[in-house]
Each structure stands twice: as structure tokens, then as C-alpha cells.
Amino acid sequence: MTVYLLANFGGPRISQEIPSFLHALLTDQDVTGGRIPPWLHRPLFSYIAKRRAHRVAEQYAYLGGRSPIFQDTEKLAQNLSQELQAPVISFHRYLTETHQDTLAALRESAGDIIGIPLFPHYTFAVTGSIIRFFLERIPEKPMAWITHFGVHPQFISCMREHIQDCLIAQGIVAEDCFFLFSVHGLPMRHIRLGDPYAKQCQDSFNALIGESEGVLSFQSKFGIGEWLVPSTKEICQSLCTKKRYIVVVPFGFVSDHIETLYEIDHLYVPMLLQRGYRVVRVPAINTSDRWVSALASIVKSSPHETILEPLLMPKRR
């Protein structure tokens, strides 16, 4: 029987897991490497993670000291398993406390393994990092991967209906709205290495926006250097539109977590409100029945990648 691996970013379940979560994230060379020699990378970013832990803990305090992404991913895995009538194992990339259980479950599995990273758009830094994680730890277990689904008809229709439901609940029509579609940012050096992320985000945005008025922007810049533009922060500071409502859609994130619940809700939405706009923030699709059904269709109809080395960020030596 085929076994499915549902992979997400992970997030601290309790405040005590914030330091280890941040350390795992920032010491991942697929995320923060590239310009720094490998011998220096881990000690440098271990130090940075320790320095940033208090500030990040203050941000998580707005969420009750934890991220909902763990529970939402677990629930989604259970519901997807019922929909597919097949085993679904969860994986939380930067929640290291859960890794041994995931690896043990995969080692015990007897069937084919298909990985499903919960990221609509492929990037070396996230989906590539997840693929590398398993190539390095269980090379004896061949895996196939669904690497992206940002223009899959089921994802597009799911997002359109989800946004429409949100507008209906607010008594708003799309003609009165300017849509701000926000996705995670990425350093330009990744794009220059051949990362397809920017093009996939643009293609996905084009498929979603239709005849509506809107913009694609990039959030969550970290560190120095050139990143994809325009940034969500800059758009919120400078946007001029005659539309009655700004609808913020974090469509690069299928799960609400710190980058939606803190960064968007507590940093960017207030910027727009202070400038006199009426703002609607569309929640992530999370564990909705519509998303479970759409994801099952995506799993059944998407191609599976098995030649994996070209999908990984070139390593600096």
C-alpha cells in the first residue's frame, strides 16, 4: 500500500520549544546558506538563533506562546488519510522533537512513499530542504514527491471559493476590493541559482486574480541582501487605490502560523487601517473540508518527481 508523507514547516507547540525550533530553522543551509562558508555557517547561525530567541518568543506570545501549525497539520493528515483511504504520516520540518517518530514510521512502512510538502510553490529553501532531509537520513527508502501545486485546478478553485466565502461572510463583493496576495519572500541569489519560486508564484497569482484588481507581494525578509519585490510591508505603506476594501490573502501559506497570525495581523493590517482602509484578512485554508477534498485530488492527479538532485540547492563547498 502507498504511504503518504504530509510535510509542513513545523512550529513550537509550547514556548519551551521556540529556541530549538529557531535553531533548526536558521542553521539549515538551504534556508540561510549560500554566501557563508559551510564551516562558519552553523556556529554563526547558532549564535544568531540564540540572540533572536527572546524577540521571537515575544511574537509567539501574541499566539499564546505556541503555533497552531502543528495541530492543524496533524488534523489535516488524519482527514487526508480518511479521504485517500491510505496511511498519511506527518512531518514537521523544524520541530526536531518529532523527527525520530516520523523517520521510524517511514522505516517501518512497506509500500511506496509519496511526499506531499504543503507549499504551493517550489523553492530550494523549503521543499528542497524537506527532500534533502530524507535523502540524507533514509537513503534506503526511495521516495517520490509532489513538488508544487500552485496552478493545479483544484488548488485554484479551492482558493477562489475560500476567498469568496470570506467576502460573503463580510457582506462584500469582489468588485469593491483590492486584493493583496502575500507569499513568503526569497533572496534573489536563490533565483539566480535557478530556483523556480518567483515564476511559480506569479503564475499562481495570475490564475487566481482573474479580472480583479490586485498585487502579488513578498513578506518575511530576513537578513541583508536583495530579496524578491515588492515587499508586503512596502505595499502596505504605499498602496493607493479607490477600492473600498483591501483583502489580504496569504495564499502562499496553507496553514496559519506566525507569519500570518503575527506578521500580517499585527504588523501589516494595522498599517493599512492607519491609512484609512477597510481591511479583510482571509484566513489560510488550514483544515477545511474543501481543502481536504482538493488536496486529495491534487495527490491523485499530480506528477511524482523521483529524480531529486536537480531539485536541490547547489551546495557551496
Swiss-Prot record:
Name the InterPro entries for this protein.
Ferrochelatase (IPR001015), Ferrochelatase_AS (IPR019772), Ferrochelatase_C (IPR033644), Ferrochelatase_N (IPR033659)
Gene3D superfamilies on file: 3.40.50.1400
Molecular function as annotated in GO:
ferrochelatase activity; metal ion binding
Q: Identify the domain of life.
A: Bacteria
**Which coarse location class describes where this protein primarily resides?**
cytoplasm
Q: Any keyword Kinase?
A: no
- GO terms for biological process? heme biosynthetic process
Where is this protein localized, as stated in its record? Answer: Cytoplasm
Q: What does this protein do?
A: Catalyzes the ferrous insertion into protoporphyrin IX.
The protein's name in its UniProt record? Ferrochelatase
